[in-house]
């Protein structure tokens, strides 16, 4: 039909089509960038949390990360990894799905002894003081932090694999495995429960 249009009309139609193409192209690029940023690594006070990690055969993506602080000290950087994004803390804690928490020590104030004490306090808060049914499992988990001294730069991966349990890694080396959903819920509740170790870290882990 362009044969029957004036030259100016043909040019206007051409320019209109070009604008539509450019808008479509720009939208595609924006969507791609948003998808990339959702699964991008994050650097916090010099610590880089990778975009993805493995939990058994599952690939997990970084849901959010932040800093565990106490008074003026930045104790560690923590990241939460899930199979799909979520900001629902209770749903995450109760889910029988692959997930993980990565911790990198950023302070010389952390030692094996006070890390173990902090974990015990975390379980007390997470369970509302009802730790007796999990006593043996908690003790076994805490012992994995006592095998060697903890120093700044150490990395801990706490990985839940359904049907297998919670695997605890220090600097990539498996320290132990604790079975049971009851234990998994109490453990992840340390960071995501109603009385978390750090409110700001919880919010950051949830990607808020």
Predicted regions and their residues:
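Sec/Tat signal peptide C-region and signal peptidase I cleavage site
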Residues: 21, 36-40
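Terminal leader/tail segments of proteins
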Residues: 40-208
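Bacterial N-terminal signal peptides
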Residues: 27-35
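Gram-positive Sec-dependent secretion signals
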Residues: 22-26
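Ubiquitous "structural anchor" signal
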Residues: 10, 34-35, 65, 180
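Short, Lys/Arg-enriched N-terminal segments with co-localized hydrophobic residues
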Residues: 3-21
């Amino acid at each position: 039909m362009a044969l029957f249009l004036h030259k100016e009309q043909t040019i206007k139609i051409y320019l209109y089509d070009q604008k539509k193409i450019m808008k479509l192209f720009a939208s595609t690029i924006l969507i791609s960038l948003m998808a990339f940023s959702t699964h991008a690594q994050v650097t916090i006070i010099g610590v880089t949390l990778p975009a993805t990690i493995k939990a058994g055969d599952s690939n997990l993506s970084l849901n959010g990360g932040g800093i565990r602080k106490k008074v003026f000290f930045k104790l560690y950087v923590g990241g939460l990894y899930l199979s799909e994004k979520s900001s629902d803390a209770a749903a995450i804690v109760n889910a029988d799905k692959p997930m993980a928490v990565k911790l990198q020590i950023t302070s010389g104030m952390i030692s094996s002894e006070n890390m173990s004490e902090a974990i015990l306090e975390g379980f007390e808060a997470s369970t509302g003081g009802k730790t007796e049914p999990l006593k043996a499992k908690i003790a076994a988990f805490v012992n994995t932090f006592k095998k060697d001294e903890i120093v700044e730069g150490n990395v801990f991966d706490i990985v839940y694999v359904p049907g297998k349990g919670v695997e605890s890694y220090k600097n990539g080396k498996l320290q132990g495995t604790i079975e049971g959903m009851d234990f998994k819920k109490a453990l992840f509740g340390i960071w995501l429960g109603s009385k978390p170790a750090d409110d700001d870290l919880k919010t950051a882990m949830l990607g808020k």
